[in-house]
Swiss-Prot record:
NCBIfam families named in the record: bioD
Binding site for Mg(2+): 16, 51, 112
Main location: cytoplasm
Name the record gives this protein: ATP-dependent dethiobiotin synthetase BioD
Binding positions for ATP per the UniProt entry: 12-17, 51, 112-115
Length: 242
């Protein structure tokens, strides 16, 4: 299997935009990439304002929203609590089953978690437990400004302590007026974590188009580095299957 697990230092940091944009760029490059966000709270999957619909729109996948996100609920709470309050039970086994179903359509998947790695996810797992099952390299999406060094370094350390590989960090929501501080934060994150910051994605104000987001991803994210990871994963998977 190949792809990336997109996580973050917090909620509302920009995971969905990053995941959808990267998938869209890779699909334009000819890769058979799909997107998967097993659990979503705050919107049902079909809601155009929700993450599943935005993933579909940005990535350009033919997959239906309720297949991108098989478990969704309106209440904006941690997924485990939201499902419990709605009287629904979702287990780690359930979301892995749907992951394997998506792999029947695509060679690689970009998987988006919920919030950060320690978020209560299914009834029996945190987000990090799901990431450990998939063993995909992580992309950590983080805020660009004050507090991000601490949050990002802690997230990376937590991931590494659980045996996960962190491919890189993307700082999302960068404003031109803050770029001096953003660059300083980038350097500190790399020095303290040993993980590269692969992109400084701009802040998108108001309504934005798929074209704007994908063009920004191509300009501000090191797509070639991520492409190298995908190729290496595919080579390892092919070698292991022989």
């Amino acid at each position: 299997m190949s792809g990336f697990f997109i996580t973050a230092t917090d909620t509302e940091v920009g995971k969905t935009v990053v995941a959808g944009a990267l998938a869209g760029v890779f699909r334009e490059l000819g890769y058979n990439i799909g997107v998967y966000k097993p659990l979503q709270s705050g919107h049902v999957a079909s809601n155009p304002e929700g993450d599943a619909a935005r993933l579909k729109a940005l990535s350009g996948v033919p997959t239906k929203e309720d297949e991108i996100c098989p478990y969704s609920i309106e209440e904006p709470l941690a997924p485990r609590l939201a499902m419990k309050r709605a009287g629904r039970t979702v287990t780690l086994k359930d979301i892995i089953h749907h992951y394997n179903e998506r792999l029947k359509e695509f060679n690689s998947l970009f998987v988006e978690g919920a919030g950060g790695l320690a978020v209560p996810y299914t009834e029996d797992a945190l987000v990090i437990d799901f990431a450990k099952e998939l063993q995909l390299p992580l992309i950590v999406v983080a805020r660009p400004t004050l507090g991000t060094v601490n949050h990002t370094v802690l997230t990376i350390a937590y991931a590494k302590a659980h045996g996960l590989t962190v491919a890189g960090v993307i700082l999302s929501g960068c404003k031109e007026c803050e770029m001096e501080r953003v660059q300083e934060n980038k350097v500190m994150i790399e020095e303290l974590s040993g993980v590269p910051v692969l992109g400084l994605l701009p802040f998108f104000e108001g309504e934005f188009t798929k074209k704007e987001v994908l063009e920004s991803a191509k300009e501000y994210i090191m797509i070639s580095k991520l492409e190298e990871c995908i190729r290496n994963e595919s080579t390892v998977a092919h070698t292991s299957s022989n």
